[in-house]
Amino acid sequence: MRNITISSERALEVIKAPQISEKSTFIAEKTKQIIFYVSRDANKTEIKSAIEQIWRSQNIQVKSVQVVNVKGKKKRFGRYLGQKSDWKKAFVSLKGDREIDFTDVKLFEDK
């Protein structure tokens, strides 16, 4: 994966939130991967550079990124049939035995 630089605003658009569930916790303990909800138009290199930029103060380096496009489920609202939006999630592996502290986010440097 090549390195690209993106703005802080784009980094926050790419990474929406960490996925916190029983399954994601199990995967994090077993395979040392962290799961994120990401923007549908983001690619692997953007996801990698966004994570490294958001958690730059913790010196986080990404080893690999795997992406899954998830189809929205069909839901019924009374007699009407609707559909939830499609979304994308990313499985991120970090170099070494690093862990991300989600409370420590510094995007802009103090001048």
Curated annotation (Swiss-Prot):
Q: Name one GO cellular component term.
A: ribonucleoprotein complex
Tell me one GO biological process term: translation
Please give one Pfam family short name: Ribosomal_L23
The source's domain of life comes to Bacteria
Q: Does the keyword Transferase apply?
A: no
Q: Provide the GO MF annotations for this entry.
A: rRNA binding; structural constituent of ribosome
Q: Give the UniProt keywords, A-Z.
A: Ribonucleoprotein, Ribosomal protein, RNA-binding, rRNA-binding
How does it associate, per the subunit comment?
Part of the 50S ribosomal subunit. Contacts protein L29, and trigger factor when it is bound to the ribosome.
Q: Family, per the entry?
A: Belongs to the universal ribosomal protein uL23 family.
Record function comment: One of the early assembly proteins it binds 23S rRNA. One of the proteins that surrounds the polypeptide exit tunnel on the outside of the ribosome. Forms the main docking site for trigger factor binding to the ribosome.
Indicate what this protein is called per its UniProt record. Large ribosomal subunit protein uL23
- Could you tell me the gene encoding this protein? rplW
